[in-house]
Amino acid sequence: MMRSLLVLVLFAMPNAHAEDLHFLVPGGAGGGWDSTARGTGMVLRNAGLIESASFENISGAGGGKAIGMLIETASHQQKTLMVNSTPIVVRSVTKLFPFSFRDLTPIARVIGDYQVLAVRSDSEIKGFDDVLARFRENPRSVKVAGGSVRGDLDHLVPALALRAAGEDPRRLAYVPYDAGGKALAGFLTGEGDVLSTSLSEAMEYRRAGRLRIIVVSAPARVPTAADVPTY
């Protein structure tokens, strides 16, 4: 399963060139949405396409609060872009919030990223088979941390992996955080046994020796983590 990060607007902006651009981030600071918004703003400034970029983080309802605000204040948001990703479709289809992804207009896909499951470098868990063994003995003994609400990709990916192994995904002990950065910080200080996150967010900490990636949700092994099995 791949996470696609999108830049969305409610409707097309009146001019191709905007002096000021405002980015609405539907999650906390330090997560994938936040870093994507800030990186996109920096690139647009450096390319001379905009004069300045501002950023606003609005957390809540798995991104639903920010989406609702953008839709309800559309007349005042002509220079606003919102960064979101594949879960916006999931949450809309499952009616986790009253708005539809069809109320927004995707204008660019900027990132495609795989999901991973990771453990701390000193963990006794060596692979997904160990996770399964612990889960089968006691589902509550394996807590999975993720930077999004229940029903989002960080929750769905380990749940689907458990279901594929013949287990009941509803028994998964999932610990949600406001953003990927907060999930990583909490996980590295000992909160949770397994981290569900994106490959790009995990790689920095893998290189630093602070965590080990045990599986990646790719159809084949990825070059940047060729030793990691897929699922």
Locations of regions flagged by a protein language model:
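Sec-dependent N-terminal signal peptides
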Residues: 4-13
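N-terminal (or domain-start) structured segment
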Residues: 17-103, 150, 167-194
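Short loop->beta-strand "edge-of-pocket" segments that line small-molecule binding or catalytic clefts
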Residues: 21-27, 31, 132-151, 212
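A bilobed periplasmic-binding-protein/Venus flytrap-type ligand-binding module shared by bacterial periplasmic
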Residues: 24-28, 114-124
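Short, surface-exposed alpha-helical segments at coil->helix boundaries
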Residues: 34-38, 42, 155, 159, ...
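A structural signal for short loop-to-beta-strand junctions that line the ligand-binding cleft
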Residues: 79-81, 98-117, 143-146
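Flexible hinge/capping segments at coil-to-helix
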Residues: 119-140, 228
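C-terminal lobe and pocket-closing loops
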Residues: 201-231
